[in-house]
Amino acid sequence: RTLSTVANGSVDLVVTSPPYPMIEMWDSLFTALNPDIADSLQRNDGYQAFELMNRELDTIWEEIERVVKENGFVCINIGDATRKIGNQFQLYSNHSRITSKFVSLGFQPLPIVLWKKTTNAPNKFMGSGMLPAGAYITLEHEYILVFRKGGKREFTTPDQRSIRNQSAYFWEERNIWFSDTWTLKGVKQTTHGESVRERNAAYTFELPYRLINMYSVKGDTILDPFLGTGTTTFAAIASERNSIGIEYDKNFSSIISEGLKNLEKKVNGSITRRLEEHIAFCSKYQREKG
């Protein structure tokens, strides 16, 4: 619940996805951290439960303020929650609560990304079906919040500028990555076995890979304080960055170790695909534009 092993001002970029407050599959984790949360849910006090869950995350956000370098970035994937507590159904806006906390810590909120998750489930709509004034809008996106600590990062020495140039991405990648809407296939939040808690906030490899290449340079240090299955670390390795990963549940260690064993093939495949897509783009551009 703290980042005591991480030195002050040692992290260039945080990329993470925490447990989502007010999503039922995370209740057991939050109530284990603070039994008052269970009491709030039993009393049907949704607002209090929501606030107490977010206060548990606040302890990590406060630590992040300590470990992130001046001019460093924080990227957080988070979803809002809809839930019926007692007889009251409503939205619990996690992204707003987290943004408020980071602003209070002195971070600058930057433009966000909406991660649109496609779903074709015929029963995805909530409420009274075809009858008006009783149905609810279905949430089909999550947020990628972006914060900066202090002002713009400067690259003043020849070595710094050289590393920055070596870390450049392709023109067409910039156009996609810096759009405010991403459509990426998500990773189902379920167990990898009965020995592992029956949920994790795993996101697709492409999500941290993009963010790491957007907001850091080669040799930087990337932190994920909610490491889960290790995706952020894998993306950092693929991007030639250093990685610090911290995970509360020790049962994930075997999953992370297995992922590291198979990482070379995954990384090489990802880089090869990226180059092939760039070559295809250049060929198409040359045919169409001359």
Where are these regions (language model features)?
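S-adenosyl-L-methionine-dependent nucleic acid methyltransferase catalytic domains
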Residues: 1-135, 139, 169-290
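Surface-exposed flexible segments
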Residues: 9, 156-162
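Conserved beta strand-loop-helix elements of the APE1-like EEP
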Residues: 136-152
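Proline-centered turn/helix-capping motifs that create local helix->coil transitions or kinks
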Residues: 152-158, 174-177
